[in-house]
Amino acid sequence: MALLLPEFDPADVRAGRDLIHRLTADAAGIQRGVLREILSRNSGTEYLRRFLGGAAGDDDDVRDAFKRRVPVSGYEDVKPYVDRVASGGEPSSALLCSDPITCLSRSSGTSGGQQKLLPSTAEELDRKVFFYAVQALVRNMSLHTDHGEDDDGGGGEGMYLMFAFHGDRTLSGLPIQSALTTYYHSRQFQECDIGGFDKCTSPLEAILCPYGEQSMYCQLLCGLLHRCRVDRVGASFAAGLVRGIKFLENHWEEMCFNIRSGQLSDWITHTPLRDAVTGQYLQGSNPALADEIASECARKPWDGIVRRLWPRARYIRTIVTGSMSQYIPILEVYGGGLPLVSPIYASTECAAGINLRPLDPPSHVSYALLPNIAYFEFLEVMDENGEKVQGTTRLDDNLGEVKVVDLVDVKVGRCYELIVTTFAGLYRYRVGDLFTVSGFYNATPLFHFSGRHDVILSIDYEKISEEDLLNAIAETDKFHLRPLGYMLVGSTAYADISTLPGHYILFWELTNTCDSNVAIDIDQTAMEKCCLAVEDHFDEMYRKIRHRGSISALEIRILSHGAFDALMDFFVSRGTSASQYKTPTAIRSKEAMMVLEERVVGRFFSQATPSCRSAEFERR
């Protein structure tokens, strides 16, 4: 265990550089060791015995047997075992992994549309500690270099929004909750500086508060009270940070009253939270600070509000890759030029990706998968020419003889789907996340997160990937919305087949950049141009089908203020963790669509068909 998860001090930058070099220079050797350790521990489990029997021999023999006999799997392969673990009728250590399963981690369900319960063990918390320690090390190496080689940058604090909510329990008493909630409640997290190797303005009682609105209010209030100490601002995901800023916009006057009077609002009723805020932060009236904050918040628009409220802030730290990329423009406005740092790639299956060049612009962010966290394989999805590899387009595909390659054998420019084998009992498991290889750091590949396999829009033969949709929206936002003074706050899509032919619907919430108010009175011609611009960015197959009339015109529906907050509340009410929530790029649930439909204030359609080369050829 110590060899795979070496202890180190994230504040010791010199030693940290050596650690990262060792991890990335010998990725192949470390990966062999990880697989050897996983198989030696778990070969007696029911799942592996089905395929490996009593496979023995040297490392190469066992590795070859693993690759030949253990099939690539998906959630439906694992679910029967998870159900048996949940029922508690037999020892969990006999089913998937030799260590007792201590928790079932619940995925958000907003990426692929399906919530999943995945096994986790006590040891997984140690891996998370190592993972976040490496993240802190990279931060100290790249973002706080002026503090010196052996200084932890301790002069500043992070104003991070973090939330842990109580989950459910299985019949056998196992907790069911998000991976982040498990981590925040753990001894490992609470024994570190609050924030996990990261001094944070939020008291632990705010992070663990079960009431989301009270938690959000007090975390922002504490961040304002410590505004002169804050040198970084963030949240796990960009959607959560934008939500926090909009919350602040609606509550800053009340917070200023709290600061001016030294009294916390009566509606903060959670006793541990109230005691922590009044005992540690709000210890008397401070009219001068209240006036400073009010002066900045009263200025409209809110361009640069993060930099203005936290003048020492060096950067914004939040995940802005994948579906979160839609929030880059609005965060750039709120940040007023602060760099957007997308620090990690993490999924419920495993947290493993570190951004080793955190100051790269968001569009160029790449992650290195730490080779000691899990065993990684990759299923090729596209070659370097952008051509799809047959048989790998859906999670339920029969892979046949399609080749799966190891971490160090991927090729630059090619797109792959991530497959993981974990200590906690996932074997050759398809995560559903797509990565394009952008280069190498020593012997370890760097991956650009390209989206998900199973988040697509499709009505006829066309298939719109998450990346296709996000790129189309980003270009339309850049060239059609922002020049008119509009800013996209939230977006999701829905394939509507309630009428024939079906069509795509984009739900957008906009603000006016001049005063930060909700944009409702919008020019019809401008929005019709946006509809066509999105369609023009879709692929040739979509445009061909549009010309044939098998899909009707794309529609944009403009939403009232708070619509995407309501969508989050809908998903949270159905078990999604608020801390892991990501606004879905596309929704499939009719119920979720109706949450947005109730808040529609404008409807616009393409008034022309998108350009199509093949249609022009057919007319000739």
Swiss-Prot record:
Gene Ontology annotations for the cellular component aspect, listed alphabetically: cytoplasm
Induction cue: At low level by auxin.
Keyword Manganese: no
Coiled-coil blocks: none
EC class name: ligase
GO molecular function, one term: acid-amino acid ligase activity
Tissue expression per record: Ubiquitous.
Keyword list, A-Z: Ligase
One of the GO biological process terms: response to auxin
One Pfam family named in its UniProt record: GH3
UniProt keyword Ligase, yes or no: yes
EC number, UniProt record: 6.3.2.-
Domain of life: Eukaryota
Family stated for the protein in its record: Belongs to the IAA-amido conjugating enzyme family.
Function: May catalyze the synthesis of indole-3-acetic acid (IAA)-amino acid conjugates, providing a mechanism for the plant to cope with the presence of excess auxin.
Protein name: Probable indole-3-acetic acid-amido synthetase GH3.7
Natural source organism: Oryza sativa subsp. japonica
Gene giving rise to this polypeptide: GH3.7
